[in-house]
């Protein structure tokens, strides 16, 4: 062993023992550990009669960590623990640690997530100065905040999400008048509260779980039913051919009338009797379905391909344990939200393209030319042809091919 008991991240002095030769890399031997950077370890506790060990989750650490009796916090065999390093040991002696936190039993729901969070030092709590900055953010939208915004509160507006959705960040409104669909897609205006360069903004850049304090994500930035909320809205006027004839991107104030789920809306569209509280919205959902079908037909006409791949959904019990795995159902409700969001994205992207403003676009690269030729040859062996134009392929050509192949054996 040429590591001298060093741990990942240690700063070491190395002596070269063999130089690179052909495919063989240069080899060295650690002669001195200059600095230890690892201060704690996450792993599985293993208990013996008079002492214990922590078996590290990090597979780059090839040593177990010794736990002296009385320094294990009464951890049990198989518990996931966080342990502080007391002695780094050496090449002949295992490092010594003290258990400072028990994350839970190894197979207990949630323990795996906590283990990853602790291992990588992912921040869970917000710094106090960030929490203090929330004091200036109101619990409800104030009258002053509504000034200068388009008032959309008189329009029937709904959110449609999964049953387990917590942060409701988009809503839909739709009316039809004189042959024109007036579609509004409203996104919670988080930037009104999280200003660029603010403490909240800087903290959010380094976070995922959660990115923003719950006061924002579950509160004033969540489009909860029955409360005024600030939104950024894309208002689109669409004719009966599915063409946008006018649009506006603006700051609005909205009030969601109902929180709906995909299941509820799908059942209503399938003809189920709507609960009393939703009866005033049945015509809205039918109108949404009508527009969704129109948009989908128009996209299909330009060659769009519907990659309807099967997805799985894991059902958990109240303790977070998986009890069922079932196919994720794509319904008329999920499709209409997909269609409206796609149309919104296209509209906004085109707006900023013509304004020549800096913008982040999601662009799919054209297929590799060599792979296309190989694919075309493969298809020819089965009696199908693929027409290439300028060494690439138009989506419409793929759409036609899939249509011909569908149902064949």
What are the roles of these predicted feature ranges?
Residues 2-5, 16-22, 85-91:
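Short, charged beta-turn/beta-strand-edge "cap" motif at the junction between a beta-strand
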Residues 12-37, 100-102:
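Short, structured interface segments
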Residues 32, 36, 40-409:
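Conserved, carboxylate-rich catalytic/transport cores that coordinate ions
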């Amino acid at each position: 062993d040429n590591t001298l008991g060093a741990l990942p991240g240690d700063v070491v002095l190395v002596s070269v023992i063999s130089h690179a030769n052909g495919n063989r890399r240069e080899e060295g031997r650690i002669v001195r550990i200059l600095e230890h950077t690892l201060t704690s370890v996450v792993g599985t506790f293993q208990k013996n009669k008079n002492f214990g060990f922590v078996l590290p989750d990090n597979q780059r650490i090839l040593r177990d960590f010794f736990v002296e009796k009385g320094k294990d916090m009464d951890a049990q065999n198989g518990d996931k623990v966080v342990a502080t390093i007391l002695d780094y040991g050496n090449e002949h002696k295992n490092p010594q640690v003290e258990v400072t936190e028990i994350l839970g039993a190894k197979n207990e729901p949630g323990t795996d997530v906590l283990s990853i969070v602790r291992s990588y030092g992912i921040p869970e709590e917000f710094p106090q100065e960030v929490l203090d900055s929330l004091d200036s953010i109101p619990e409800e939208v104030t009258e002053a905040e509504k000034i200068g915004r388009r008032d959309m509160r008189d329009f029937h507006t709904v959110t449609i999400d999964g049953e387990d959705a917590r942060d409701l960040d988009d809503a839909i409104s739709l009316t039809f008048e004189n042959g024109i669909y007036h579609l509004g897609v409203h996104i919670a205006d988080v930037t009104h509260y999280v200003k660029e360069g603010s403490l909240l903004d800087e903290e959010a850049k380094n976070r995922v779980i959660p990115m923003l304090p719950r006061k924002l994500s579950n509160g004033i930035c969540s489009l909860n039913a029955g409360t005024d909320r600030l939104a950024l809205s894309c208002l689109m006027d669409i004719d009966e051919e599915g063409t946008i004839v006018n649009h506006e991107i603006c700051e609005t104030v909205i009030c969601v009338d109902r929180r709906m789920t995909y299941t509820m809306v799908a059942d209503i569209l399938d003809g189920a009797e709507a609960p009393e509280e939703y009866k005033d919205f049945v015509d809205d959902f039918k109108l949404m379905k009508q527009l969704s079908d129109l948009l989908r037909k128009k996209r299909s006409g330009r060659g769009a391909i519907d990659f309807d791949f099967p997805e799985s959904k894991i059902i958990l019990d109240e303790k977070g344990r998986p009890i069922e795995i079932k196919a994720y159902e794509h319904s008329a409700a999920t499709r209409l939200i997909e269609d409206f969001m796609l149309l919104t994205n296209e509209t906004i992207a085109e707006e900023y393209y013509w304004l020549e403003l800096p913008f982040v676009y999601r662009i799919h690269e054209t297929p590799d030319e060599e792979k296309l030729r190989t694919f075309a040859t493969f298809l020819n062996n089965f009696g199908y042809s693929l027409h290439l134009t300028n060494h690439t392929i138009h989506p419409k050509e793929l759409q036609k091919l899939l249509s011909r192949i569908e149902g064949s054996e």
